[in-house]
Amino acid sequence: MARLKVGIVFGGSSEEHAVSVKSAQEVARNLDTEKYQPFFVGITKDGAWRLCDGPGQDWENGDCRPVVLSPDRSVHGLLVLEQGQYRSVRLDVVLPVLHGTLGEDGATQGLLELSGIPYVGCDVQSSALCMDKSLAYVVARSAGIATPDFWTVTGDETIDPGRLTYPVFVKPARSGSSFGVSKVCRPEDLATAVESARRYDTKVLIEAAVVGSEVGCAILGNDPDLIVGEVDRIALSHGFFRIHQEEQPENGSENSTPVVPADIPTEKRSLVQETAKAVYRALGCRGLSRVDMFLKEDGEVVLNEVNTLPGMTSYSRYPRMMAAAGLPLSEVIDRTLSLALTGKLR
């Protein structure tokens, strides 16, 4: 039986480029190459697309050829430039391993919709919705899901610091990981935090701090057939959780440790999982996502954010939560590809 041709797209021009490369390395290690034939498409930080041998740390200096993903449905794949001529490579499915702007905000998904190639993960609408935390909060609230109190600042707008109750978190509304995020405890520090967030997005989100534990839940599937991973909890020694901000995240964080399974009572774990599924459905997610939440002392679960293409590195939360539930990364990859092709969990 012929192997299915899988385009694995990684890298990208967002601030999460390096994390994407590491995620792609883990995907490459865990892909069943007896079943799938991978075509690795790396996107440089400058936005150039290259067909390469694999997502090694020095992949750009290897045997790379210029490539584009054709929006022409008759091509159904890649156009590779070789010796001054383009040749086409028909793909059966695409697995985006991209994080942040232009990777999980609906842009890449729109190109894939034009191409007609099935792809892993959320569609254009849900990708864009989840990327904009303020819009995700609006939709979640309409579905009866608790969110932090929040305000948005766009363009040259300002906000009266005296309106807020501190502490607050200031963050780019449409950015991944913890880039540009600040905890503000005094009104006089608000303007600086807003300017820091504007380095990453023209729309800034200001959230009232939620007192509680940070918890997460990995989800795999299409509604109504969903698999939920074990819940995790972020154990903090001080400060706040800054994912992917360390120079060597493989060696752990200086202030946080993910605990999987979360050391919380069974009934609270179940509530977190049910809330995560409600968020997933309300925001129209499909394929996979990681839902991050807060668990308050009174038992209320509050939405933090949704990652539609969560990290797949050796230290990432999503694969750890799924592994704790009995699904190794190789199985997760296989099931997401099956979902993209058939719409059903096998």
UniProtKB/Swiss-Prot annotation:
Mg(2+) 1 binds at D292, E305. Its EC number is 6.3.2.-. One of its GO terms (cellular component) is cytosol. Signal peptide: none annotated. It is found in: Cell membrane. Keywords: Antibiotic resistance, ATP-binding, Cell membrane, Cell shape, Cell wall biogenesis/degradation, Ligase, Magnesium, Manganese, Membrane, Metal-binding, Nucleotide-binding, Peptidoglycan synthesis. Its cofactor is Mg(2+); Mn(2+). One of its GO terms (biological process) is regulation of cell shape. One of its GO terms (molecular function) is ATP binding. Binds 2 magnesium or manganese ions per subunit. Mg(2+) 2 binds at E305, N307. ATP binds at residues 163-216. The keyword DNA repair does not apply. The keyword Manganese applies. NCBIfam families: D_ala_D_alaTIGR (TIGR01205), D_ala_D_lac (NF000206), D_ala_D_lac_Sc (NF000129), PRK01966.1-4 (NF002528). Required for resistance to glycopeptides antibiotics. D-Ala--D-Ala ligase of altered specificity which catalyzes ester bond formation between D-Ala and various D-hydroxy acids; producing a peptidoglycan which does not terminate by D-alanine but by D-lactate, thus preventing vancomycin binding. S.coelicolor was found to be of intermediate resistance to vancomycin although it does not produce vancomycin. This is Putative D-alanine--D-lactate ligase. It comes from Streptomyces coelicolor (strain ATCC BAA-471 / A3(2) / M145). The lineage of its organism: Bacteria, Bacillati, Actinomycetota, Actinomycetes, Kitasatosporales.
